[in-house]
């Protein structure tokens, strides 16, 4: 019984699987329609309606099974009858595996997505139908054995595979798919699908259950992977499926069932939200990008293992294609992400509209309209997402197709192979589990899992050999295909080389033929001229003789006879002599004789010429002569010699016997009566055949010419026949008119037959260039020239591409701040780096290679930083000279990063030394013996001193950052120093509390130092960037300050004893410091982990800044509160007069802490002007004064009177700066050198610079220098002295709480934070009234500590969020305020138009027409002219991409002088134009001022045949001033920019002057123009703008000009003469434009904002229209002109007035 059941179940499971496969492969019955529906909501609604309709029809068909008619049966499902089978399940499985064919099974290894959903059911409803989830679509490509998943379905579902094909015949009721509509065409009978519950192990009678295992996707099982997987995918072991197919009249089912099962409508698909769809599209594009990276790595690996350039060439092309596709996918991903954000915003807006308070009808209608509008936008955006996804999939498919053509080498990864356990054994386990207890079921399930794992292991071993064989076979096939492809490519190249040689040879022959044709044409023209002269002389001779005969017989003839004789004379005179092939009249018979005058009647009929000869009334047209390319004149001189004789058919004057009488002689005249049109037609036919034959020979290969041999022979025969007809027409001499008509008809018939045959030949010929027969024979010569030009263009294009292929335009921009995306592909592409003892040269070589690596994006510039750090680790032991030698070998683009990181490593060593110093100090404090403590401190000082000199050198390299290095921890250091110095003595009883306080202070410093050291090391890790190094410099400097304060505190151990009353408050403050140290440690530890993690990003760094600032605020507040404890009892604490205790705010007298007497806190006497500190400070002051003076001189305009003197002073000041810098460094290293410095000399030098410092300011400066010696080095106090000449800034007055003081802004910039209002400072620092007590009470309880910390943290976090928003807004402002777009070009265009009007071509006609030029003098005798022109114009430029447009005005003047000789002009002109451009959408009146100075040289050359050539060359220098206002929070920052622009222009125009009868002149012109514009690097200055730098940009444009001008003469009015109107129009087209990217850096409040501008190219086509009026009075010419210039983004109006005086 068990065997029978097992047999039946196995057969039924096979049938069900085969049926499922058949339904998918025949028409994609379910999968294809659902693909389109999943992309939008409308398709999902269509799916639900269709499923309901299908379920209704199925229920009707099941209910009326007996009453409905049987539809037409196309086919049936054939199910074999059950047979007895005695084989075991394992034997059956082995037989099935052995029967499977590797090549014949097209659906093998194709995973089919699970089309059904598990639905829970009760144990009693085992046999009932289950709900079915509609299947998702999957396209199956049989040929390539790939599966393409639906673009909107990204979830991996369990799949199922069927090993064999079923026997299936499709019936009329099967659902079909309409390709056109992409939807269902469903018949009434749709198969119902039922599913049994996986929770029950019993099955209904006759229902098969197939055990399956879950499918585990392998790394190679990607949709776009070409590697065939031998492993059959597993199926789900928990899902037991049962399918039943039924139709209305059919009784053929899988198993007969006695009970009718009503169909259950399927559950509709759950639509994903728009945001989820966008996220999935981005993930799909990212998957495609990763796949491209893998392919790129495989291609590069194959290239390395391939030998020979010919073999590597297709692989290199494939590599370029993959790299280009990867770049496109990156762009698609970014665009899809942006669209996803927009969709998410719209979706959230819709949700907010749907929810909320109760609304009235008007509000509801408004919300509904907004919802509809948002839904439409979402649909459009989703369509764009779909297109992006399709584009990514298309690129993936193209790469797959290209990869098939080559053999790629990649590591062979064994795919896990699983095996389906036998159905019988699994079924037996199910039957046994039904009767077992719960514990037995658990044991059986565990045993089933063990059996399953064993079966999988056996399957892996069994299939590994087959997998290896399959891989090897595939590699052999691909290798063979690759070799075949290479052979084909090689053959093609050889053929192309041969064809190129043949074309070159043909071109040489063609050039020779053209030269011969020119020679023949010249000879024929000369012969024709001689022949015409001979005809004229012969006609005159005949007329003279006729005149003599007529004088003798005048009296005897009547009027009628005279008229008859006149007609005969006309026929005789008008008869042509002969063609070029006939002989001509002898020169000896052309002698003229004196004759008598004709009678009066004859004279009125026959006119005479100047010499008295008779002239014919009409002149007959000369015969059309065409010289063929293959006809040559053997001896051109023979044509001249042939003129001396006449042919036999022509009689001379002596032979005509005129003396016998006029009417009595019989005269026979021979004429050439053939139609000249036929001759012309024959010539065109011959020329066309010759051209087409040569084109076919040039554009076809030799192998193709062999196949076209018959057609070419026919064309050759037609060519010879046409030549024969042509020669016959030229030589035909016919007497009778009937013969003439017959001959003409026969020749025309032959020509038409030749043309029709030629049409057939050319239509049947298919060449590589797609040559077709041209029906228009009049354009054959034009077509020949065009074909030659096309060949030249193609050759030029090929040469250009070959150059680009050999010298690619690699990206030179190296971004030191990469992201994490795309790094895997680059790392895999570049390969692993060697790690060896001598790897320094290899690293250098690798860096040099990466310098020219074609990066896909800025994200992929991570690799140079990684290699740079590796190189640094190898060169850490080298000396500075050795390291400098290594750095010189590195590429200049990467060398700055290498040297910068070297300096950072040095600073890291200083940090380690300082940490060791702090540790020694702590140990010394804990040591009971004071002698040992002193020794420990001395040892630590020695250890730290080893790096002190190098640290000072490092400071010299960072002068611009010193302020923020030392300003940040200044207040903390002051408070700690004051605290330590305030203790004059310490009693023996208070030693222990004092030790604890010092230990707490040192512990806080050491913890901070160690954490900073760890952070420093993390910054040097590969995941760091140069920006993060700069952002952490403030905190690094804090690390240097803490140990110095600790040394001060340790030095006061033996001081006097303090009072007993301070004991308890000091212990509380120590607890607060301990708390701060623990919080700092935790925060820094979290930050350190986040920085070191590979997945960290810029966002995580920003998020950690809140914690960092939180820690700083706690330390500051605790230090100040700790110091305030002693202020009540001690009178010698050192504090600042201003009470500067907050960021961006100074408290007043009532809010500040008590200020003790400062006299006791001074270390040295402040009145001592000769102290070393004072002298060093004065040296710094003098250095800063020199810098300020130099900057003032540099801001002066270069056009001022003393520009040369200013330049010389600037050079001298720069030399002084260098000298002072070296002197200060030397004094810092050796303080003994300060003895040579004189206070009076420095003060005198300062007086000379205009920056004298008063004595009050110096005393204040000395007091501050005493309290904070480090402030001297950073230069902050010196800057305050220079900014205020009367006294140093002592603090601003108290303002309102919500205002931001300027000092706060400055200090906020120094700390990298925005200035906070007073209320924020009170919350953050807890130093207002009543807050000191709260800070002192931090140690009372843990709850109060946590609350205070939370308050401080929330305040800092809120402030940082505000700061980030304002930085983002600032970045947006900078991106919109683009640099100069084309303002300089606008000025140059205006100037060129003014000069071009002077250079209008003026042909000196005899009718004294209006001068063509704008103000040119009519009289050609004028040699010199002086002219002036004034202009005014407006222009408007629209917004281009993300750059703001502008409106501008231009006004200026031009003066010129030229010399004119016979309408040939040469002159020079100077122009000065002032322009103002105001940027649109600017609330701050931002504008740009340009002063342009242009020098132009122009000329005009008059050419023959009314042509004239104009040329213009100009060079200009533009001085540009930009005035821009930035909004940084509530602060308005005004910046001023001064820089220059150099522009060069050159143009040439060819004019043709055409004069009409009414003195109207039309002048068409054509020409070229080239323009080059170049901006210099500039620095921007302004309030709080520390630095703005703009890299040099350059713009090159080559354009063509085509236009025309019309001059209309007018009548003279008043004293004006030569009045005329001018109209002009021109079209300018840019052929080539080259622009550079602009990198702009703006530094505000110590925050750098970087913006990269890609200057958009100007529109290709521009138009210029103009009109004017011109007139002259005596020697003065006046003209008025107007021009209108426009293109896609730009409009300009310009008017001008010109006055010219002829000298």
Curated annotation (Swiss-Prot):
Transmembrane segments: none
Biased composition (Polar residues): 149-164, 171-221, 232-260, 1155-1169
Main location group: membrane
Domain Autotransporter: 1419-1703
Leader sequence residues: 1-28
Region Disordered, annotated ranges: 93-265, 490-509, 1146-1169, 1284-1305
Pfam families: Autotransporter (PF03797)
Domain of life the protein comes from: Bacteria
GO cellular component: cell outer membrane
Subcellular location: Cell outer membrane
Keyword terms of this UniProt record: Cell outer membrane, Membrane, Signal, Transmembrane, Transmembrane beta strand
Coiled coil: none
Ranges of Acidic residues composition bias in the record: 1291-1300
Biased composition, class Basic and acidic residues, residue ranges: 110-128, 490-506
Gene3D superfamilies per the UniProt record, alphabetical: Autotransporter beta-domain
Name by which UniProt lists this protein: Putative surface cell antigen sca1
């Amino acid at each position: 019984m068990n065997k029978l059941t097992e047999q039946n179940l196995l057969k039924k499971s096979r049938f069900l699987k085969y049926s499922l496969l058949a339904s998918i492969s025949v028409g994609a019955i379910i999968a294809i329609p659902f693909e389109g529906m999943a992309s939008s909501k409308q398709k999902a609604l269509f799916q639900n309606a269709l499923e309901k309709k299908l379920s209704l029809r199925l229920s009707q068909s099941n209910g009326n099974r007996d009453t409905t008619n049987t539809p037409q049966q196309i086919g049936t499902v054939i199910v074999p009858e059950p047979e007895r089978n005695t084989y075991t399940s394992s034997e059956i499985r082995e037989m099935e595996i052995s029967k499977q064919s590797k090549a014949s099974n097209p659906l093998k290894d194709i995973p089919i997505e699970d089309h059904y959903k598990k639905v829970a059911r009760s144990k009693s409803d085992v046999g009932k139908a289950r709900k079915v989830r509609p299947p998702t679509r999957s396209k199956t490509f049989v040929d390539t054995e790939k599966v393409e998943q639906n673009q909107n379905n990204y979830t991996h579902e369990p799949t199922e595979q069927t090993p064999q094909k079923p026997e299936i015949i499709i019936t009329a009721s099967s659902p079909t798919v309409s390709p056109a509509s992409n939807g269902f065409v469903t018949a009434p009978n749709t198969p119902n699908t039922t599913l049994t519950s996986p929770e029950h192990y019993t099955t209904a009678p006759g229902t098969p259950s197939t055990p399956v295992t879950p499918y585990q996707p392998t790394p190679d099982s990607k949709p776009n992977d070409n590697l065939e997987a031998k492993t059959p995918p597993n199926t789900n072991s928990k899902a037991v499926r049962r399918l039943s197919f039924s139709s209305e009249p059919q009784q053929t089912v899988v198993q007969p069932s006695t009970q009718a099962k009503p169909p259950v409508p399927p559950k509709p698909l759950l639509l994903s939200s728009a945001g989820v769809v966008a996220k999935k599209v981005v993930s799909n594009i990212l998957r495609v990008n990763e796949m491209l990276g893998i392919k790129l790595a495989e291609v590069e690996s194959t290239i390395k293992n391939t030998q020979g350039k010919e073999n590597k060439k297709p692989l290199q092309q494939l590599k370029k294609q993959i790299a280009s596709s990867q770049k496109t996918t990156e762009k698609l991903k970014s665009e899809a992400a942006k669209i996803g954000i927009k969709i998410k915003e719209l979706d959230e807006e819709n949700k907010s509209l749907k929810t909320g308070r109760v609304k009235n009808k008007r509000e509801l209608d408004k919300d509904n309209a907004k919802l509809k509008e948002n839904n439409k936008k979402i649909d459009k955006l989703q369509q764009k997402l779909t297109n992006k996804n399709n584009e990514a999939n298309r690129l993936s498919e193209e790469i797959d197709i290209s990869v098939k053509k080559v053999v790629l080498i990649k590591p062979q990864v064994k795919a896990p192979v699983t095996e389906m356990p036998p159905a019988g054994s699994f079924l037996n386990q199910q039957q046994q589990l039904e009767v077992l207890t719960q514990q037995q079921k658990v044991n059986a399930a565990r045993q089933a899992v063990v059996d399953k794992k064993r079966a999988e292991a056996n399957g892996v071993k069994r299939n590994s050999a087959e997998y290896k064989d399959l891989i090897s076979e595939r590699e052999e096939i691909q290798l063979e295909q690759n070799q075949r492809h290479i052979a084909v490519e090689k053959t093609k190249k050889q053929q192309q080389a041969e064809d190129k040689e043949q074309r070159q040879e043909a071109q040489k022959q063609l050039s020779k033929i053209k030269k011969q044709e020119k020679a023949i044409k010249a000879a024929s023209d000369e012969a024709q001229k001689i022949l015409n002269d001979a005809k004229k002389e012969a006609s005159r001779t005949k007329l003279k003789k006729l005149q003599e005969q007529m004088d003798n017989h005048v009296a005897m003839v009547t009027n009628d006879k005279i008229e008859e004789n006149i007609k005969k004379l006309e026929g005789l005179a008008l008869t042509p002599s002969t063609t070029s092939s006939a002989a001509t009249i002898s020169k000896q018979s052309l002698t003229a004789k004196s004759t008598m005058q004709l009678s009066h009647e004859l004279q009125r009929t026959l006119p005479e010429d100047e010499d008295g000869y008779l002239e014919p009334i009409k002149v007959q047209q000369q015969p059309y002569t065409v010289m063929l390319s293959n006809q040559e004149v053997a001896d051109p001189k023979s044509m001249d010699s042939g003129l001396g004789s006449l042919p036999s058919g022509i009689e001379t004057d002596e032979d005509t016997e005129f003396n016998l009488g006029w009417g009595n002689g019989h005269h026979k005249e021979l004429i050439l009566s053939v139609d000249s049109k036929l001759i012309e037609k024959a010539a065109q036919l011959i020329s066309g055949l010759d051209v087409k034959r040569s084109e076919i020979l040039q554009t076809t290969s030799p192998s193709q010419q062999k196949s076209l041999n018959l057609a070419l022979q026919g064309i050759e025969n037609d060519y010879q026949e046409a030549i024969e007809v042509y020669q016959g027409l030229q030589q035909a001499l016919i007497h009778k008119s009937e013969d003439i008509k017959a001959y003409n008809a026969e020749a025309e018939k032959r020509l038409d037959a030749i043309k029709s045959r030629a049409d057939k030949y050319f239509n049947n010929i298919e060449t590589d260039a797609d040559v077709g027969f041209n029906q228009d024979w009049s354009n054959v010569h034009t077509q020949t020239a065009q074909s030659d030009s096309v060949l030249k263009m193609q050759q030029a294009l090929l040469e250009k591409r070959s150059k680009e292929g050999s010298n690619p335009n690699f990206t030179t921009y190296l971004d030191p701040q990469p992201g994490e995306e795309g790094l895997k592909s680059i790392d895999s592409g570049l390969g692993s780096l060697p790690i060896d003892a001598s790897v320094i040269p290899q690293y250098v070589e690798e860096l040099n290679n990466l310098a020219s690596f074609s990066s896909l994006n800025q994200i992929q510039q991570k690799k140079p930083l990684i290699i740079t750090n590796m190189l640094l680790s190898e060169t850490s032991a080298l000396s500075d000279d050795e390291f400098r030698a290594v750095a010189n070998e590195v590429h200049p683009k990467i060398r700055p990063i290498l040297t910068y990181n070297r300096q950072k490593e040095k600073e890291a060593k200083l940090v380690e030394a300082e940490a060791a110093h702090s540790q020694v100090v702590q140990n010394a404090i804990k040591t009971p013996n004071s002698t040992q403590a002193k020794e420990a401190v001395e040892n630590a000082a020695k250890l730290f001193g080893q790096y002190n000199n190098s640290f000072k050198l490092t400071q010299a390299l960072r002068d611009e950052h010193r302020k923020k290095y030392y300003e940040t921890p200044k207040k903390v250091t002051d408070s700690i120093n004051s605290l330590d110095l305030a203790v004059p003595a310490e009693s023996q009883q208070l030693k222990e509390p004092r030790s604890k306080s010092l230990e707490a202070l040192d512990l806080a410093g050491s913890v901070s130092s160690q954490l900073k050291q760890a952070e420093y090391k993390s910054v040097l890790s590969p995941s760091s960037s140069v920006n993060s190094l700069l952002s952490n410099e403030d905190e690094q400097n804090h690390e240097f300050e803490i140990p110095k304060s600790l040394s001060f505190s340790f030095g006061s151990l033996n001081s006097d004893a303090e009072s007993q009353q301070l004991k308890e408050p000091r212990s509380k403050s120590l607890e607060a410091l301990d708390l701060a140290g623990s919080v700092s440690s935790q925060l820094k530890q979290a930050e350190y982990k986040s920085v070191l993690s590979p997945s960290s990003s810029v966002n995580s760094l920003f998020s950690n800044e809140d914690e960092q600032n939180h820690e700083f605020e706690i330390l500051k507040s605790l230090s100040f509160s700790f110091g305030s404890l002693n202020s009540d009892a001690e009178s010698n604490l050192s504090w600042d007069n201003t009470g500067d205790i907050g960021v961006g705010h100074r408290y007043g007298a009532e809010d500040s802490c008590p200020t003790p007497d400062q006299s006791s806190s001074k270390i040295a006497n402040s009145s001592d002007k000769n102290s070393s500190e004072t002298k060093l400070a004065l040296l710094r002051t003098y250095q800063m004064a020199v810098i300020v003076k130099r900057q003032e001189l540099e801001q002066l305009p270069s056009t001022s009177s003393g520009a040369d003197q200013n330049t010389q002073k600037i050079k001298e000041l720069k030399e002084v700066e260098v000298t002072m810098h070296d002197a200060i460094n030397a004094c810092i290293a050796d303080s003994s050198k300060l003895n040579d410095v004189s206070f009076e000399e420095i003060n005198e030098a300062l007086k000379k610079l205009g920056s004298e410092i008063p004595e009050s300011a110096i005393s204040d400066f000395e007091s501050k220098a005493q309290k904070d010696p480090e402030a001297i080095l950073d230069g902050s106090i010196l800057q305050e002295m220079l900014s205020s000449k009367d006294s140093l800034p002592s603090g601003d007055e108290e303002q309102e709480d919500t205002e931001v003081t300027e000092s706060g802004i400055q200090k906020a910039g120094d700390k990298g934070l925005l200035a906070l209002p007073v209320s924020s400072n009170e919350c953050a620092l807890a130093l207002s009234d009543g807050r000191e007590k709260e800070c002192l009470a931090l140690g009372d309880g843990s709850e109060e500590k946590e609350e205070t910390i939370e308050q401080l943290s929330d305040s800092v976090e809120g402030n940082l969020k505000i700061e980030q928003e304002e930085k983002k807004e600032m970045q947006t402002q900078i991106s919109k305020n683009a640099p100069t777009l084309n303002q300089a070009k606008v000025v140059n265009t205006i100037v060129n138009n003014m000069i071009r009007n002077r250079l209008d071509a003026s042909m000196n006609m005899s009718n004294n027409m209006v001068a063509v030029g704008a103000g040119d003098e009519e009289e050609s005798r004028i040699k010199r002219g002086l002219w002036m022109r004034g202009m005014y114009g407006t222009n408007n430029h629209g917004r281009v991409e993300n750059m703001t447009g502008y409106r501008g005005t231009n006004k200026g003047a031009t003066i010129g002088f030229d010399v004119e000789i016979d309408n040939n002009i040469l002159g020079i002109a100077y122009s000065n134009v002032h322009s103002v451009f105001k940027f649109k959408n600017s609330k701050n009146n931002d504008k740009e001022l340009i002063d342009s100075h242009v020098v132009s040289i122009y000329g005009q050359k008059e050419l023959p045949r009314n042509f004239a050539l104009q040329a213009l060359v100009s060079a200009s220098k533009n001085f540009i001033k930009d005035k821009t206002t930035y909004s940084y929070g509530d602060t308005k920052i005004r910046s001023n920019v001064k820089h220059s622009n150099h522009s060069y222009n050159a143009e040439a125009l060819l004019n043709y002057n055409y004069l009409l009868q009414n003195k109207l002149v039309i002048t068409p012109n054509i020409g070229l123009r080239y323009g080059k514009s170049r901006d210099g690097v500039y620095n921007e200055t302004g309030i709080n703008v520390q630095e703005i730098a703009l890299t040099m940009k350059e713009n090159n444009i080559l354009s063509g000009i085509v236009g025309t001008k019309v001059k209309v003469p007018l009548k003279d009015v008043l004293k004006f003469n030569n009045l005329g109107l001018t109209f002009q129009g021109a079209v300018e087209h840019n052929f080539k434009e080259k622009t550079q990217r602009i990198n702009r850096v703006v530094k505000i409040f110590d925050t750098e904002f970087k913006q990269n501008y890609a200057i958009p190219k100007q529109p290709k086509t521009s138009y210029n229209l103009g009109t004017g009026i011109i007139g002259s009075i005596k020697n003065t010419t006046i003209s008025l002109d107007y021009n209108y210039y426009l293109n896609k983004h730009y409009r300009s109006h310009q008017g001008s007035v010109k006055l010219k005086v002829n000298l």
